[in-house]
Amino acid sequence: MSSTLSAYRNALRATRIAFRQDLPILQAARMQLKQGIRDNSNLQTQPEIEEAVQKLNDVAKFLIQNIVQGEKQQDGKYFLNFHEKTELGDNETIKQGRKEMGSLAGKKGNSIKSCKD
């Protein structure tokens, strides 16, 4: 039970970090969390409970690392509100994948085959 409570608190904390400047979305996210806890309150076996707790921890981690709120500025551009826990990638994996894939504008890459091949 304590791991469940800890996961729930972590998820609430994650919603506060991810949606700190957007009260309607924060409230909706917290309602979803509460509903999910209620829906899973009837789980009986330890593996089911552990799976639900792990899923809740994964959701909290995803919210903290991947959700960034943005505000539209007067000039039409968006200001993104990054925080210290936001995961910032370097796009290296995207660049590596393009070498293998080739162009999708008609030229066939190494890993792309047509139906005629």
Swiss-Prot record:
Coiled coil location: none
Principal location listed in the UniProt entry: mitochondrion
Molecular function as annotated in GO: protein folding chaperone
GO biological process terms, semicolon-separated: mitochondrial respiratory chain complex III assembly
Localization per record: Mitochondrion matrix
Gene Ontology cellular component list: mitochondrial matrix
UniProt keyword list: Chaperone, Mitochondrion, Transit peptide
Transit peptide: 1-10
UniProt keyword Mitochondrion, yes or no: yes
Domain of life: Eukaryota
Family, per entry: Belongs to the complex I LYR family. MZM1 subfamily.
Function: Assembly factor required for Rieske Fe-S protein RIP1 incorporation into the cytochrome b-c1 (CIII) complex. Functions as a chaperone, binding to this subunit within the mitochondrial matrix and stabilizing it prior to its translocation and insertion into the late CIII dimeric intermediate within the mitochondrial inner membrane. Modulates the mitochondrial matrix zinc pool.
PANTHER family associated with the record: COMPLEX III ASSEMBLY FACTOR LYRM7
Binding partners and assembly: Interacts with RIP1.
The protein, known as: Mitochondrial zinc maintenance protein 1, mitochondrial
